[in-house]
From Swiss-Prot:
Compositionally biased tracts (Low complexity): 390-404, 489-502, 960-992
Annotated keywords: Nucleus, Repressor, RNA-binding, Transcription, Transcription regulation
Entry function: Acts synergistically with sop-2 to maintain the transcriptionally repressive state of homeotic genes throughout development. Not required to initiate repression, but to maintain it during later stages of development. Also required to repress expression of other genes. Binds RNA in a sequence-independent manner.
Lineage: Eukaryota, Metazoa, Ecdysozoa, Nematoda, Chromadorea
Subcellular location: Nucleus
Protein name per Swiss-Prot or TrEMBL: Sop-2-related protein 1
GO molecular function, one term: RNA binding
The protein's assembly and partners: Binds through its N-terminal region to the N-terminal region of sop-2.
Basic and acidic residues composition bias: residue spans: 406-415
Start and end residues of each stretch annotated as Disordered: 355-374, 379-422, 466-509, 948-1000
Length: 1000
């Protein structure tokens, strides 16, 4: 939310020697509207007070340093020729070494006014005291009620700058939207190094909405440092310092650019439009602490209550107060000019925090002794007295419309009781009509003058809020912290009579997200604190060297062979850093767990907790909980690498895992040794009653007679040796049937391109090439395109496919099949449907030969290679097109023509003739990647004539050698080519559509 904090600059007026008709009757102090992030230096201010009282007079005041050549300009007065405006009277005065300026109208640039009562545009020319420097601005207003508007007024404050002749042709724009008025206002500044003329003045065009100029559009301020010192240091304004400021020279690297963004004003009627972005040129040789001092002096900030903090954006880093902007700012080469972002924040000072803490202690003592009700009444009376004194000391600067009785009654409907006097005095003094928008994390907006003040129970979270998403700078997100008691309000549980929750919700604004008590996480509210166990980490001292190598290889994601070549000292340092990172991660997790316990304890502290504090605690709880879950997901301890199997000796690769469990003989060895079927899955070694490892009794028998005698256990008893080792064979077989369940069916053989290769690389592992995500599909169940991404991402496989050239053909059927398989893969992996083809797009280009890949990357490139071999062509799509294609679910035998048209439109293909789908693209060098018609539906007579013609042209030795199996083994493209007529051998046209068969 936003709080409107008001400031004003007061100037003591002095009498002049001008005539009485030019002297104003009443003087209203000029004011300005600085942005939320103040620029670095402000020098000369153009303070314009435009008061349209009954549409008669327009007044302008220009405060500037005294100049000798002021008399060379001629005073002029112009009159309006339309509407109710009768005269334009320029007047000027002298305010403590400040001169005035002439305001004259450019009658040649006035556009015709069709209906002056409903709207109009007037252009003026404002001449400054600098020679050859001119400022022209135009303004327009729109009235919604027509000629009946008799009295309305508004005020506009503009920041102006001092411009030297070397800076020319600087254009800027400013916008002002009056509060609760059907009135629009705009200003346009044009700076040039030549005297302004009424005939050649042109208004610059607005930049393109997508250009860089439009992004940084707004008033530009050129502020030299020497003149800034002269204006800000009023006590040191001497003729010598003035001459020094005017004669100061600046190099190209003596100034930098700061970009400032004005956030939107938030009122009880909702947020207004966002303000402009300001571009400021300032001295690069200045220090950060000097910048803060100038801003405090310029804004007249009372440091006893509020302190100013500067935060750099994504381009400016304020590390030290004594740092120079030139040293801490770095340039960006990809932009046309150097721009830096700056953010100003107003936070409670240390003395203000001490007062708030002292007041909280008094409340706690009064609550303990049962005198809390009397303390509340005393605090309300004392606060009302302080508010009355502070309001009487501030002069009233409201305009006639704001001080009208109707507006006063309207604002009384949403008035709230005042907050703590100390904080409100710091925020509201000195008061001026124009607000400064400061981002502060509170649920109440404090608008202009007559607006509602903040309630006491809404004061607790006076903390600086992170910048909004619409801001031009990117500030770092603060780490989740528990709300401290030092920044809470003085009376949290105070409920003022006469106020209601509904009124407070109106004052909060439309951007406040309310969270009910049921939305709070478990552990907050009145529930007891939740037990959050902390994790302890114990590192072993004597870690094997092999475990260290595995830990470093897993942490750095490098092969073990490469890690083994490292020096032992480097290996020890990396392993030590891994251990330190694990300790820090566990330490951070324990701190977060302690914060959760503090949040739970604070939520159960008082039963009458306000909704604002509930909302703040819920957000903090969720933020801390998410960070703990993130740490748990990323936590990898060095002890995990110690549980891995031992490494092979130096220079040898790790052996692949066996195809069968330990102790189980393969079927071929069982058949060679003549093992009966009931013992083929028995282990070669068994554990006896004493815990020792014994060989299988069947394997210990030397000849076939003894084996047959053991099998017939009903008549022949086993020998003493077998009895001592293990009991009956039947019991052993029964136990093995219980302990070793039937083995699952072996995986299907891999694709023909990988026959014998994957089994050599990973024998016994499940084959990821045969992807079967959905077994319910009975049609077209030949998955030969997409390889499934395996879950074992740590395994590595070399890419053993040589490079190849992609064909220019397009197979529509295979493309549809590939899209359906990618859709099934997306469903099985629960991926985003709007990105289900990313697995296809990321597979191009192919890796080089023998490149080491993970299982997931290997399957991704393998799927893309299979698609290219099957003539699958899918262009790069947006996420919306991918989602539409995902929801289409087109099949090769689809009968809906609209689906086919939608599919061809998404794939950016030309529709075939007569809506005959699907079609296959024939080889063509003229047009690649577009499906065309290759055949038409033929009648039975045409087919018989075609077969008769083919038999007559074929030699007798060939006969009918083409069978259905050969036709099925050929690719769809070859089949289509074989069945086409000889006419298809003609040269293709530019549309790549071969002529069709003609009936005989």
């Amino acid at each position: 939310m936003t709080i409107n904090i008001k400031y004003s600059s007061k100037f003591s007026s002095s009498k002049t020697s001008s005539s009485e008709e030019l002297k104003p009757k009443t003087y209203i102090p000029a004011y300005y509207q600085p942005p939320v992030s103040m620029p670095k230096y402000y020098v000369n201010w153009l303070r314009i007070k435009l008061s349209l009282n009954k549409l008669k007079n327009i007044r302008a005041i220009y405060l500037f340093d005294q100049c000798q050549n002021f008399n060379q300009y001629q005073e002029s007065s112009r009159k309006f020729s339309a509407g109710q405006v009768s005269s334009l009277t320029p007047w000027y005065s002298n305010f403590s070494n400040y001169s005035t300026v002439i305001l004259r109208m450019k009658d040649t640039s006035l556009p015709p006014l069709e209906n002056p009562s409903n709207g109009g545009t007037y252009l003026f020319n404002l001449i400054t005291v600098f020679p050859s420097i001119a400022l022209s601005f135009n303004y327009s207003w729109r009235g919604d009620t027509g000629p009946s508007i008799s009295i309305f007024s508004f005020s506009l404050s503009v920041l102006f700058f001092s411009l030297f002749p070397q800076h020319k042709n600087i254009c800027a724009r400013a916008w002002c939207r009056p509060f609760r008025r059907s009135l629009s206002f705009s200003l346009r500044f044009i700076m040039s190094s030549e005297p302004a003329s009424s005939s050649t003045e042109k208004v610059p065009e607005e930049p393109h909405p997508h250009s860089i100029k439009h992004k940084f559009q707004g008033p530009q301020f050129v502020i030299p440092r020497a003149l800034s010192d002269y204006v800000l240091n009023v006590n040191n304004q001497t003729p010598e310092s003035y001459e020094k400021a005017l004669n100061a020279k600046y190099g190209r690297d003596d100034y930098i650019t700061l970009c400032l963004h004005v956030t939107s004003l938030c009122t009880e009627y909702g947020p207004l439009d966002d303000g402009p972005e300001y571009v400021l040129l300032c001295d690069s040789r200045a220090r950060v602490d000097k910048l803060i001092e100038d801003l405090v002096k310029l804004l007249e900030i009372d440091t006893d209550y509020v302190q100013l903090e500067l935060h750099g954006g994504k381009r400016l880093h304020l590390q030290k107060p004594d740092a120079v902007l030139r040293d801490i700012a770095y340039k960006q080469s990809n932009e046309g000019s150097d721009k830096f972002f700056l953010e100003m924040k107003l936070v409670p000072s240390e003395s203000m925090k001490a007062k708030i803490m002292k007041q909280e202690e008094e409340e706690e003592k009064a609550r303990k002794h049962g005198q809390y009700q009397q303390y509340q009444e005393y605090h309300q009376q004392h606060q009302a007295m302080n508010d009355g004194q502070s309001s009487s000391s501030v002069p009233s600067t409201s305009s006639p419309s704001c001080s009208s009785e109707a507006n006063r009654k309207e604002m009384e409907t949403v008035r709230e009781p005042a907050g703590p006097s100390e904080l409100m005095r710091a925020i509201n003094a000195p008061v001026a009509p124009a607000p400064v928008v400061i981002k502060i994390e509170t649920p109440v907006a404090l608008p202009e003058e007559d607006e509602t003040l903040m309630d006491d129970d809404e004061m607790p979270s006076l903390t600086v809020e992170a910048p909004s998403e619409e801001a031009s700078f990117e500030a770092e997100q603060p780490s989740p912290q528990v709300p401290q008691a030092s920044i809470e309000g003085p009376s949290q549980q105070q409920q003022i009579p006469g106020t209601s929750q509904q009124k407070r919700q109106v004052a909060r604004g439309s951007r406040t997200n309310m969270i009910s008590y049921h939305d709070l996480p478990p552990g907050t509210g009145n529930a007891p604190p939740m037990a959050c166990p902390q994790v302890t980490l114990k590192l072993e001292k004597n870690v094997p060297f092999e475990a260290k190598i595995r830990a470093v290889a897993g942490y750095t994601r490098k092969p073990i062979s490469e890690v083994q070549k490292m020096r032992p000292s480097d290996l020890e340092s990396i392993f030590h850093s891994i251990c330190i990172a694990s300790v820090q991660r566990i330490k951070r997790r324990n701190e977060l767990v302690q914060q959760l316990q503090e949040i739970n304890a604070q939520s159960c502290k008082s039963p009458t907790m306000t909704m604002n504090k509930k909302f703040t605690l819920a957000k903090a709880y969720q933020r801390v909980q998410n960070e703990i879950e993130k740490i748990d997901r990323e936590q990898i301890l060095p002890q995990q690498y110690m549980n891995m199997p031992p490494m092979p000796p130096q220079g040898q690769q790790r052996l692949p895992p066996p195809a069968y469990p330990p102790g189980i003989l393969p079927p071929q060895q069982n058949r060679q040794q003549g093992v009966p079927p009931q013992f083929q899955r028995s282990p070669q070694f068994m554990i006896g009653p004493d815990g020792q490892r014994y060989a299988h009794p069947y394997m210990q028998l030397p000849n076939s007679n003894q084996r047959a005698r053991i099998l017939n256990t009903s008549s022949v008893q086993p020998s003493e040796e077998v009895r001592n080792r293990l009991v009956k064979i039947e019991a052993m077989a029964m136990n093995m049937a219980q302990l070793n369940p039937p083995r699952p069916p072996p995986p299907q053989p891999p694709h023909r391109a990988l026959q014998g290769e994957l089994q050599f690389l990973r024998p016994g592992a499940p084959d990821p090439c045969n992807f079967r995500p959905d077994s319910k599909q009975t049609y077209n169940n030949t998955y030969v395109t997409v390889a499934s991404p395996a879950t074992l991402t740590n395994s590595i496989i070399p890419w053993h496919f040589p490079p190849y050239e992609k064909s220019g053909r397009l197979n529509v059927s295979n493309t549809i099949k590939a899209i359906n398989e990618y859709r099934l893969l997306c469903n099985s992996r629960q991926a985003d449907p709007a990105s289900f083809l990313e697995f296809y797009f990321l597979g191009d280009p192919m890796p080089h030969f023998n490149k080491i890949l993970s299982i997931a990357d290997y399957n991704m490139y393998l799927s893309r290679r299979r698609c290219d071999e099957a003539d699958v062509k899918i262009h790069r799509m947006s996420h919306s097109d991918q989602l539409q294609l995902y929801l289409l679910e087109l099949q090769s035998d689809e009968s809906n023509v609209e689906k086919w048209k939608t599919f061809y439109r998404i794939m950016q293909w030309d529709l075939p003739l007569n809506n005959e789908f699907p079609r296959i693209l024939l080889p063509s060098s003229l047009d690649i990647g577009r499906p065309v018609v290759d055949r038409k539906k033929k009648s039975i007579d045409q087919v018989m004539n075609h077969i008769h013609r083919m038999h007559s042209q074929r030699p007798p030795s060939m006969g009918n050698s083409s069978t259905s199996s050969e036709a099925s083994s050929t690719s769809p493209t070859n089949a289509a080519t074989a069945t086409s007529s000889p006419a298809s051998n003609r040269p293709t046209t530019s549309t790549a559509q071969p002529p069709t068969l003609n009936p005989t």
